[in-house]
């Protein structure tokens, strides 16, 4: 093996070219070769001969090659060299390093990539599973909410089929509708949830209350007072005071006769059971709205009655066209509906197309036609002369009545069994 070395000492520079020859111990047999190796533990050593030879040595401009060769001579150095440390271990380390670099590292990189991909796939699968579970949970929640909403809607709709169910439903909502203020609160909530169903329920309550008030619950003074107050039902009023007429005729009959009317029967008939309200979310019911409500029914009343003109007024009555006496039956009909036409709503004294909640009332404007028939021709002619045979309540003393619609439902709730 050839070597070149440079030595620097202050200003002097020396260049040395030398050779190193290494050889094993001479052996004649394989056993002698084996004997030249020495294994102690894991350290394998071998006897080697070293011989150095100088090819050239210069120091500055001086050639010292001959001197160096003479000084070195033919000396041969024998030395036990650790093959493990000098050859085997470095080779093993190099092989190990190379193995790691060429085999392990790519494999590890590949496995790490595969592991990363596997972990990514696991995470993605986990996320998909979580997303699927979330979607399933949300779908189940929506399904349960839908079932709940359907059930709640059904319960709400059922509550608008009878007074008893209405009372039970709102009691679960924390409202005691036997109390007028809480009834109004319940009706507001119900109406703004479903206008037509609630309106239809109110009109059904209106009809039922009129029927019960004069028939099956006519002796229920407590319920009457609680629902309508001491003055009683607002419409229809039984007797002479319940007949719509001009103020002149009322004064004539009440002041100059002893007129008496006894209610024999009352029935509610020909109802339209599909009532609705022409409600506008922004404008609601306008004050002069034409035909704001769609409903109709008839109230038929049968009276027996009589009157005699007082002696003091006999001559005046004859001159005024009032029969001096009457006795018999009177058939009266109220046709009640929402047909408030433009000719009515434009009247100066029109009370307004009311469907108006207050704290304890629901004001409601009626359109009413009044029809009266009696057999006695003279009295009938008087009624016809005053248009009482077929009177459309439009203005003045015969303008459309306004009632507290909630009081009718209240009466039904108080008396429902």
From Swiss-Prot:
It comes from the Bacteria. InterPro entries: DUF237, DUF240. Pfam families: DUF237, DUF240. Belongs to the MG032/MG096/MG288 family. This is Uncharacterized protein MPN_234.
